């Protein structure tokens, strides 16, 4: 009866849903909880002893522990003694209560319920199970799984990350399962991947040939388990305590000088943020082309490695792969520069994103003119693939070349600051003009067309950019030379391929190639001065006008506008430019002066400095442009010797000090001092002498009006003594009046008035009394 009384509590808290066991085993993502789901058949057919069950269970969990253990095993030794005692008591209870597991399982099979808190239970006897599991061999894992699942018991609720499930029975006491999170530490490690690599066929559903499904299922499992466990973590004290101990151990390691992994490194924070726990997803981009890296990733995944070491190892593999790929592309492009591209020859056409990444890496690891040659060749190969499209659309011969070249070159130069000028110059109009016929290129710098597009070549723009960055000249000059050679070679080959190109154009390109090589041999120092243009203002005007163009215009409309502009420029050239027989005085308008002193030059010098460009069979536009640069160089050298720069007031000194000049200077100084003394003395005398007569004059001036006033006063007649008589009469009257007052008679009216006043006073007093009462 004791068992029957306790049945409802066990069935309510049972963590197993027996109807879902087979469905969960067929899922591709094999969760750790599936190890501890108990089937009905295994519970009824089990006949092993409790000790063998405990050993098989510990063997299974030891195998899981070996697969999932990270190098923070010091954490296990730092557990408190109270937990060890509790684990021993729980182990003794487990041996007594395992006898009732079959009855409880039979009852639970009738009332199947699903435990929502199965993933946060904790087993305090994990250490005793671990010690017993060491006695059994590892090979007993597949056979002991069915028996070990019977003895898994349920225990009180204690929060943890990845628990294993047990059933409870008997006296009603609950036994907590073992938590793998206590073995693994505070770090959340992906259990699905590592377990699937070590388990045998009864346990693993996925095969080794499905690494992508593994990674997807792994990410799904990590998200679900982390979302469930994080809901109960705030109230738990276990993980926080383990974390503090782990940090304490790492601090001790740091004090001893031992290497310790950084717990707050960028890699771990990134993995926590994205939910990635293993190296499998890092090796995914390489898996597309190199299948050997998958095996290397599996081998490295079996060993416990520091995440930083894994990161560096993967970075080294990627670097080696990029170098191998760049060498392969370089060999393919050098063997057949006009053949198919290296991406299409392999039979596999990778996506656009890895191609961008590869070219960007190639620019990082392979600096210098060699990488530039390979990139230009890749561009040319990409354009060669579009030749059938050119044959189908003869009216649009440059559109597809524009799209291919801009994609490759713009992505190849994003990470290098020294090639920022190339990035600015690689707009569609310019790249399309690189492969246009020669007469179109010859109109780029001469005229500003009405549609205001940006007619500047890559070499010219980079040379102008070198004026602002003279520190990087030595490195970028090689880049300019290689670019100019590449453009000339492309022009030469395209003029051979285009039958519509005239003989004049091909001759001019060949002359360019010959003269460029001879000038590089004869004049190596000319390159730096060539970059200093005086027509930079014109180039910047074209640049600003090109930026103001609306970006929404379609490439077809742009191409049609460009063709019309070239035709108009050709007509203007034929009208303005002289032929060979014409007079040499007819030239282009003068270039804007950059220095104020150049206005002092004579008209003959300014005519000499102007660029004389004529359309002839023997000379091309680029050759004539270089001639103009030479003239500009000469003019810049001469402009430094003009009168405006010279200070003609300065007199050069002799070989030593001149005594005569020093004596003359000393005499002048002495004379100046003497003259100053004389002037001072004269001024002092002049100031002291006129001060005395001034005082006398002032005294005389003040005395004169006084005397005049006295004389005038004497002339005034004296007044009569009337005032004195009045005063005497007054004095006489006052005593008589005082005597009269004593003798005056009494006035009757005054007495009447006084009596009346007294009566009125009494009346007023009576009114006051009446008013108060």
Curated annotation (Swiss-Prot):
BP GO annotations: axoneme assembly; brain development
Keyword Ligase: no
Biased composition (Acidic residues): 59-84
Protein transport in keyword set: no
PANTHER family in alphabetical order: JHY PROTEIN HOMOLOG
Species in which this protein is naturally found: Bos taurus (Bovine)
Source organism, top-level taxon: Eukaryota
Protein name, as recorded: Jhy protein homolog
Disordered: region residues: 1-247, 325-373, 496-526, 596-615, 713-743
Ranges annotated as biased composition (Basic and acidic residues): 29-43, 112-134, 728-743
Any Pfam family the entry gives: JHY
Keywords tagged on the record: Cilium biogenesis/degradation
Compositionally biased residues, Basic residues: 353-369
Purpose: Required for the normal development of cilia in brain ependymal cells lining the ventricular surfaces.
Cysteine-cysteine disulfides: none
Compositionally biased spans, kind Polar residues: 10-28, 48-57, 145-154, 334-351, 500-516
Low complexity bias spans: 216-229, 598-610
